[in-house]
């Protein structure tokens, strides 16, 4: 029997607290693709932020998955503390080792690149190997064996966020 999804208390109050949405499921093996865009979030840095994000990660844990982190339009107000980033890395390492296939970073800005460089010193190499900076988006997404339909779903979401309103 499948476990019911946990509800994030921050998202219950404000659906824009976090950005962690299920985009697609790979037809080939059931791997789910989740999308995060920090520029779309409204939750401020707080002690509860890590616990709330862990709820979303727990809900992703039922099948293999890929996490797309889109850094488009990120400003300083969207960055997180290294404590938060390290907490997410520890959670992924402890609870998602066999099921998180890749973390695809779109438009990796300087802060994200520095955070990843710092994390390399403190997390296991197998987590670092899962990071894909998609500077050449199509090539990188095809390299992790996504179909064109799945790539289009990611790009549609990405360009909707990147395009001026």
Indicate where each model-derived feature is located.
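Basic, amphipathic alpha-helical/coil surface patches used to engage anionic, phosphate-bearing ligands
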Residues: 1-165
